[in-house]
Curated annotation (Swiss-Prot):
Domain FAD-binding PCMH-type: 22-187
Keywords: Cell cycle, Cell division, Cell shape, Cell wall biogenesis/degradation, Cytoplasm, FAD, Flavoprotein, NADP, Oxidoreductase, Peptidoglycan synthesis
Organism this protein belongs to: Chlamydia trachomatis serovar L2 (strain ATCC VR-902B / DSM 19102 / 434/Bu)
SUPFAM superfamilies assigned: FAD-binding/transporter-associated domain-like, Uridine diphospho-N-Acetylenolpyruvylglucosamine reductase, MurB, C-terminal domain
Cofactor dependency: FAD
The name this protein goes by in its record: UDP-N-acetylenolpyruvoylglucosamine reductase
Lineage: Bacteria, Pseudomonadati, Chlamydiota, Chlamydiia, Chlamydiales
Amino acid sequence: MTDSFPFSVQESVPLSRFSTFRIGGPARYFKELTSLSEALTVFSYLHTHPLPYIIIGKGSNCLFDDQGFDGLVLYNNIQGQEFLSDTQIKVLSGSSFALLGKRLSSQGFSGLEFAVGIPGTVGGAVFMNAGTTLANTASSLINVEIIDHSGILLSIPREKLLFSYRTSPFQKKPAFIASATFQLTKDPQAAKRAKALIEERILKQPYEYPSAGCIFRNPEGLSAGALIDRAGLKGLKIGGGQISEKHGNFIINTGNACTADILELIEIIQKTLKKQGISLHKEVRIIPFRL
């Protein structure tokens, strides 16, 4: 079947290797993207040859099914960056967001310090409007390049894109995020702020276990982690999955968790908080075996 593609693909690639949860069965087809020209070829093909597909970066916000994915998984590894001016930088979407924040802050640039604690790609950060209490991705974003459903590269200025808390227009109107351009400022204190942020995260979050980061979005004016803690759910374990004792909004893989373990814990949290009149909405992407 792989011979029918006009580009190279792999079969039966374990998705657990591409998930920070370390959970997931095999992808029916798997394609690593390493250049924009390659991505244009792939999306032009998919426009005329319908096939279920998903796009992943570092898999830091995904929960794959134990059966895997019955379609094509596109792994975005398109990396690179260039300064367009003294304080504007264009970054390809497969680049590490955390490394970008660390590198820029160490060079005295402010605007992306918060990225040092976000373990995804630039494309994933734009898709989720990832952020912290300091800022979010949209705060310094000035332009996004996408490949649309027909395989055409488009450039969209920030003012034409509606972002909100952990939400971007790309969640409802799928497109391949090719690059993002950010506006920075020069600030010698940027590195100090970035260092303080990562130290705080290491102290408060369970980095020693595989996870997908925060499972739920914070309700307006509230902390999901604090709500889960007050509900007495921290430490609850099902199979190999556990609600972290360190941070209530993290579900961790203690070594042999399966998708069902994580989903059951998510359901318990939601039902428990619902009884208190609080609705928690998932931040993590649940990717089923079949779309």
